Amino acid sequence: MQVEALTRRLKTSIIELIDKGYKYFGAGGALGFDTLAAQTVLALKNDYPHIKLILVLPCITQANSWSVDDKAIYEGVKAAADKVVYTSHEYTRGCMHKRNRHLVDNSSACICYLTEKTGGTAYTVDYAQSKNLLVINVAKK
């Protein structure tokens, strides 16, 4: 799927949640969909200034091995976020899992881009469904 089409689906889904009364949006800060989702929430703050972006990050050192360009985007999103939460101080084997569970445990809806039946995203979406969260998969819209 093209980034432009995905961004449109994501924006539409976020606006639908805003229209239902949602105002806090969490993102995990990973490269790819997490970053796109965070950037979309930040862009929507122009029209919906009451919404808040909460970055839930796995560890302080998450971006250490990223490219200069990816780090710059990450730092920009982090600086613009309304709140930043770290679920672990240092990188550990389970810190991504801990971050994902924190996002689900503190949410009532989950917007995802899920195309595989296995992996971290699939596990997190399964966990969200087990917690009865509203799950919106923009890969299927």
What are these regions (language model features)?
Residues 1-141:
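Acidic/glycine-enriched connector segments
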